[in-house]
Each structure stands twice: as structure tokens, then as C-alpha cells.
Amino acid sequence: MLVIKMLFKYQIKTNKREELVDITPYIISAISESKVKDGIAVIYVPHTTAGITINENADPSVKHDIINFLSHLIPKNWNFTHLEGNSDAHIKSSLVGCSQTIIIKDGKPLLGTWQGIFFAEFDGPRRREFYVKIIGDK
């Protein structure tokens, strides 16, 4: 058995202060390039005002609802003690999380029919990066 470990770095430009950007094609590309058939992919964002999440990718209103609910739950102008203007983004990032792990089966991400992998931007627009670590066998 040959264990493969590869790290991929991607950069994206977000367009709004808060949005969910579909990064599923990047993950599929990393898995394909790694040639791993069975294993895991860890998707990680090294930012304190962004996150990674998995959710429905068929109906765009789901992305809208997630952003709206988080904004309702954590309003931008709440009474924060961290006063740099992006305090809400730090809390949203903590709730969403900075990584996701997915299973690779038969050379593809094991996702549900409607699932996609999203970069969650909470303090954009700006240039961002995320990493994909692939571990598995050919």
C-alpha cells in the first residue's frame, strides 16, 4: 500500500463582506491531482474571519439563509469589546469553524447528492487562501 500525502494551496477573491463561495471544484481538482482513491481530505482556512462549511449546493437561497441567520444571531453592531469593526466576523468564524474533513472514496469526495463545500467569508471582500491536505492510498 502506497500512502500519499499532498498539500494544495488555493487563493480566491471574495466579492462581498459576507458570502459563501463554492470551493467544491477546487477540492475535486486536488483529489484528482493527488491520484488518491481512498482516504481523506482536510480543508483548512488560516483566517480568523472566515470558515469552511458543508451544506446544500443546489438551491442558492440556502447560502443566503445561512448568512442572514448568522447576521441575525451575531449583529455587526453588537456591544463588542474588540473594536476593529469586524468583531462579528471573528465570532461567526468560530461558530462555522476553520476546517472540514471529508472522505475520499473511489477518487472522489464522498458528499451527499446536494452537498457542496463552501468558503465562508465574514469580513470581505478580499483575497483569501485555503489549504487542502490529501492523505490516502492509490
Curated annotation (Swiss-Prot):
Similarity comment: family membership: Belongs to the UPF0047 family.
SUPFAM superfamilies named among the record's database cross-references: YjbQ-like
Domain of life assignment: Archaea
Protein name from the UniProt record: UPF0047 protein MJ1081
Stored InterPro entries: UPF0047_YjbQ-like, YjbQ-like_sf
